[in-house]
Amino acid sequence: MTLIDGKAISEQVKQEIAAEVAEIVAHGGKRPHLAAILVGHDGGSETYVAAKVKACEVCGFKSSLIRYESDVTEDELLAKVRELNEDDDVDGFIVQLPLPKHISEQKVIETIDYRKDVDGFHPINVGRMSIGLPCYVSATPNGILELLKRYRIETSGKKCVVLGRSNIVGKPMAALMMQKAYPGDATVTVCHSRSKDLVKECREADIIIAALGQPNFVKAEMVKEGAVVIDVGTTRVPDASKKSGFKLTGDVKFDEVSPKCSFITPVPGGVGPMTIVSLMKNTLLAGKKAIYQ
């Protein structure tokens, strides 16, 4: 069993990005600038945004954090999004999700200029991705592709089961795993809460990508010998022994599943760090105007 070390790979990729940024700046180019909008004080969102700001420092990017209280109006937030769309100094920006109930996440996503949508959530980026055109691919699926590549995991002709059908992970992941490229060319099945025989589907899978948000959902009897298991789940489960009062728990029951796997990602330290690195890669592309002029 090989443990896929997302933390180590993410550090490596950040160093590669930093070297490229240093080169750009040395030749008189502009330092890439990522802005983030954070609404309210959700614990998970605070943690993610802090990690993104820190990653920007390591990569040599400029970063801006714009904060609002959770009672900010939708109009106020959309006005800020439009302002960032027009700001030539900002290469890419994200609005950290989830947003408070009174704000339409979809409206916010669609208001972002797709050329600055480094999260890859805008319908134009999603559509381009689904037909294999250059675009900003959403960060978590892109991070998973990077891990498959760096560990040279064979995907062509393999049966891949994606657990979950969210717009952020499940759907794009399925589209990417069946694209005509490496990593891809897999035979993809998407399972979700309404799927029948989910256990049977998983048992036949060469690759399982679990993105349900249900702690310890994937058990040993659902995984065949030699499977590759990618765990996208990060649920905060209360744990009195931890200083924070919780433990990050994946969708896979790691201790019992890992002995059967050829490759598996841990939680934390697997997919999570790669998500942030993918955002950095998209920001670099935005700064270089590599995809959109």
From Swiss-Prot:
Span of the signal peptide: none
Keywords: Amino-acid biosynthesis, Histidine biosynthesis, Hydrolase, Methionine biosynthesis, Multifunctional enzyme, NADP, One-carbon metabolism, Oxidoreductase, Purine biosynthesis
Source taxon at top rank: Bacteria
A GO CC term attached to the entry: cytosol
GO biological process, one term: methionine biosynthetic process
CDD domains in the cross-refs: NAD_bind_m-THF_DH_Cyclohyd
Protein residues bound to NADP(+): G164, R165, S166, S193, T234
Keyword Amino-acid biosynthesis in annotation: yes
Reactions mediated catalytically: (6R)-5,10-methylene-5,6,7,8-tetrahydrofolate + NADP(+) = (6R)-5,10-methenyltetrahydrofolate + NADPH; (6R)-5,10-methenyltetrahydrofolate + H2O = (6R)-10-formyltetrahydrofolate + H(+)
Pfam families assigned to the protein according to its UniProt record, in alphabetical order: THF_DHG_CYH, THF_DHG_CYH_C
One function term, GO molecular function aspect: methylenetetrahydrofolate dehydrogenase (NADP+) activity
Keyword Ribosomal protein: no
Record EC number: 1.5.1.5, 3.5.4.9
Pathway: One-carbon metabolism; tetrahydrofolate interconversion
Function: Catalyzes the oxidation of 5,10-methylenetetrahydrofolate to 5,10-methenyltetrahydrofolate and then the hydrolysis of 5,10-methenyltetrahydrofolate to 10-formyltetrahydrofolate.
Record note on quaternary structure: Homodimer.
Family stated for the protein in its record: Belongs to the tetrahydrofolate dehydrogenase/cyclohydrolase family.
Protein name (Swiss-Prot/TrEMBL): Bifunctional protein FolD
Provenance organism: Bacteroides fragilis (strain ATCC 25285 / DSM 2151 / CCUG 4856 / JCM 11019 / LMG 10263 / NCTC 9343 / Onslow / VPI 2553 / EN-2)
